[in-house]
Protein backbone atom coordinates (compact mmCIF):
# COMPACT_ATOMS: atom_id res chain seq x y z
CA UNK A 1 0.00 0.00 0.00
CA UNK A 2 2.21 2.76 -1.27
CA UNK A 3 0.57 6.16 -0.94
CA UNK A 4 -2.30 5.66 1.47
CA UNK A 5 -4.58 8.56 2.21
CA UNK A 6 -5.67 7.28 5.60
CA UNK A 7 -3.98 6.02 8.75
CA UNK A 8 -5.27 3.41 11.17
CA UNK A 9 -3.82 3.26 14.66
CA UNK A 10 -4.19 0.04 16.66
CA UNK A 11 -3.72 0.64 20.39
CA UNK A 12 -2.94 -2.56 22.23
CA UNK A 13 -2.15 -3.95 25.65
CA UNK A 14 -0.84 -7.20 24.06
CA UNK A 15 -3.58 -9.23 25.69
CA UNK A 16 -6.40 -11.41 24.32
CA UNK A 17 -8.09 -8.88 22.00
CA UNK A 18 -4.91 -7.78 20.22
CA UNK A 19 -5.16 -10.35 17.44
CA UNK A 20 -8.80 -9.45 16.75
CA UNK A 21 -7.94 -5.75 16.70
CA UNK A 22 -5.17 -6.37 14.17
CA UNK A 23 -7.39 -8.56 11.97
CA UNK A 24 -10.08 -5.89 11.94
CA UNK A 25 -7.48 -3.21 11.20
CA UNK A 26 -6.35 -5.21 8.16
CA UNK A 27 -9.95 -5.52 6.94
CA UNK A 28 -10.61 -1.80 7.37
CA UNK A 29 -7.31 -0.89 5.70
CA UNK A 30 -8.21 -2.97 2.64
CA UNK A 31 -11.58 -1.23 2.36
CA UNK A 32 -10.31 2.35 2.76
CA UNK A 33 -6.71 1.83 1.52
CA UNK A 34 -5.04 2.87 4.76
CA UNK A 35 -1.69 2.43 6.47
CA UNK A 36 -1.68 0.52 9.76
CA UNK A 37 0.30 1.58 12.79
CA UNK A 38 0.48 -0.65 15.88
CA UNK A 39 1.25 0.93 19.26
CA UNK A 40 1.69 -0.59 22.71
CA UNK A 41 2.37 1.11 26.06
CA UNK A 42 3.42 -0.49 29.31
CA UNK A 43 3.59 1.11 32.75
CA UNK A 44 7.10 1.24 34.26
CA UNK A 45 5.68 -0.09 37.53
CA UNK A 46 4.75 -3.30 35.70
CA UNK A 47 8.37 -3.71 34.62
CA UNK A 48 10.53 -2.58 37.54
CA UNK A 49 10.13 -4.44 40.83
CA UNK A 50 13.26 -3.33 42.70
CA UNK A 51 14.71 -0.14 44.09
CA UNK A 52 18.17 -0.67 42.65
CA UNK A 53 18.85 1.53 39.64
CA UNK A 54 21.03 -1.10 37.98
CA UNK A 55 18.36 -3.79 38.41
CA UNK A 56 15.74 -1.39 37.09
CA UNK A 57 17.80 -0.72 33.96
CA UNK A 58 18.32 -4.45 33.47
CA UNK A 59 14.58 -5.09 33.84
CA UNK A 60 13.73 -2.35 31.36
CA UNK A 61 16.22 -3.67 28.79
CA UNK A 62 14.93 -7.22 29.21
CA UNK A 63 11.31 -6.10 28.89
CA UNK A 64 12.22 -4.06 25.78
CA UNK A 65 13.53 -7.18 24.04
CA UNK A 66 10.58 -9.34 25.19
CA UNK A 67 8.00 -6.75 24.09
CA UNK A 68 9.63 -6.24 20.70
CA UNK A 69 9.67 -10.02 20.14
CA UNK A 70 5.98 -10.35 21.16
CA UNK A 71 4.93 -7.58 18.78
CA UNK A 72 6.94 -9.06 15.91
CA UNK A 73 5.43 -12.51 16.55
CA UNK A 74 1.95 -10.97 16.41
CA UNK A 75 2.52 -8.87 13.31
CA UNK A 76 4.79 -11.10 11.18
CA UNK A 77 2.14 -13.69 10.17
CA UNK A 78 -0.34 -10.95 9.27
CA UNK A 79 2.22 -9.11 7.16
CA UNK A 80 3.16 -12.35 5.41
CA UNK A 81 -0.41 -13.58 4.79
CA UNK A 82 -1.98 -10.25 3.85
CA UNK A 83 1.02 -8.69 2.02
CA UNK A 84 0.66 -5.38 3.83
CA UNK A 85 2.94 -3.18 5.88
CA UNK A 86 2.29 -2.63 9.56
CA UNK A 87 4.47 -0.11 11.37
CA UNK A 88 4.91 -0.97 15.02
CA UNK A 89 6.20 0.86 18.05
CA UNK A 90 5.92 0.71 21.80
CA UNK A 91 6.78 2.80 24.82
CA UNK A 92 7.25 2.49 28.54
CA UNK A 93 5.70 5.29 30.55
CA UNK A 94 2.45 6.87 31.64
CA UNK A 95 -0.13 5.10 29.50
CA UNK A 96 -2.43 8.06 28.86
CA UNK A 97 0.42 10.49 28.14
CA UNK A 98 2.17 8.07 25.77
CA UNK A 99 -1.06 7.31 23.91
CA UNK A 100 -1.88 11.00 23.59
CA UNK A 101 1.64 11.83 22.35
CA UNK A 102 1.53 9.00 19.81
CA UNK A 103 -1.92 9.98 18.53
CA UNK A 104 -0.78 13.59 18.16
CA UNK A 105 2.39 12.60 16.30
CA UNK A 106 0.89 9.97 13.98
CA UNK A 107 -2.47 11.75 13.38
CA UNK A 108 -4.60 8.67 12.60
CA UNK A 109 -7.99 8.81 10.90
CA UNK A 110 -9.24 5.66 12.63
CA UNK A 111 -8.28 4.33 16.06
CA UNK A 112 -8.88 0.66 16.87
CA UNK A 113 -8.93 -0.56 20.47
CA UNK A 114 -9.58 -3.93 22.00
CA UNK A 115 -12.03 -4.04 24.86
CA UNK A 116 -11.36 -6.12 27.94
CA UNK A 117 -13.68 -8.62 29.53
CA UNK A 118 -15.86 -6.90 32.05
CA UNK A 119 -15.06 -7.65 35.66
CA UNK A 120 -17.90 -8.52 37.98
CA UNK A 121 -17.22 -5.57 40.29
CA UNK A 122 -16.10 -2.93 37.82
CA UNK A 123 -17.08 0.49 39.10
CA UNK A 124 -14.85 2.62 36.93
CA UNK A 125 -15.02 0.87 33.55
CA UNK A 126 -12.30 0.86 30.92
CA UNK A 127 -10.30 4.01 31.55
CA UNK A 128 -8.29 3.94 28.31
CA UNK A 129 -11.35 3.65 26.05
CA UNK A 130 -13.03 6.51 27.92
CA UNK A 131 -9.82 8.57 27.73
CA UNK A 132 -9.54 8.12 23.94
CA UNK A 133 -13.26 8.83 23.52
CA UNK A 134 -13.06 12.08 25.48
CA UNK A 135 -9.77 13.44 24.23
CA UNK A 136 -9.67 12.63 20.50
CA UNK A 137 -12.23 13.35 17.82
CA UNK A 138 -11.41 10.42 15.56
CA UNK A 139 -13.43 7.44 14.35
CA UNK A 140 -13.02 4.80 17.02
CA UNK A 141 -13.54 1.07 16.56
CA UNK A 142 -13.77 -1.00 19.73
CA UNK A 143 -13.16 -4.71 19.13
CA UNK A 144 -14.22 -7.35 21.62
CA UNK A 145 -12.85 -10.85 22.00
CA UNK A 146 -14.01 -13.18 19.24
CA UNK A 147 -15.20 -10.40 16.95
CA UNK A 148 -14.85 -11.16 13.26
CA UNK A 149 -16.57 -8.30 11.50
CA UNK A 150 -16.97 -8.04 7.72
CA UNK A 151 -16.22 -4.41 6.88
CA UNK A 152 -16.70 -4.95 3.15
CA UNK A 153 -20.45 -5.31 3.58
CA UNK A 154 -22.61 -2.33 4.33
CA UNK A 155 -23.39 -1.89 7.97
CA UNK A 156 -24.73 0.72 10.31
CA UNK A 157 -23.63 -0.50 13.67
CA UNK A 158 -22.18 2.82 14.67
CA UNK A 159 -23.60 5.35 17.03
CA UNK A 160 -22.80 8.87 18.02
CA UNK A 161 -21.12 9.38 21.33
CA UNK A 162 -20.22 12.89 22.32
CA UNK A 163 -20.94 14.07 18.77
CA UNK A 164 -18.73 11.62 16.85
CA UNK A 165 -18.75 8.15 15.30
CA UNK A 166 -17.97 5.15 17.44
CA UNK A 167 -18.17 1.70 15.89
CA UNK A 168 -18.43 -1.27 18.20
CA UNK A 169 -17.48 -4.31 16.17
Residue ranges and their predicted role:
Residues 66, 90-94, 146-147:
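Short beta->alpha linker loops
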Residues 34-35, 84, 108, 138:
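Short glycine/serine/threonine/alanine-rich loop segments
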Residues 102-152, 159-161:
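Gly/Ser-rich helix-loop-strand patches that form or flank binding pockets
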Residues 1-3, 77-111, 165-169:
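Structural beta-alpha unit
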Residues 37-39, 87-91, 141-143:
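General small-molecule cofactor/ligand-binding pocket signal
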Residues 56-69:
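A short acidic, glycine-rich active-site loop
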Residues 21, 48-51, 100, 123-124, ...:
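Short, well-ordered secondary-structure micro-motifs
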Residues 2-53, 159-169:
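Small/aliphatic-rich secondary-structure junction motif
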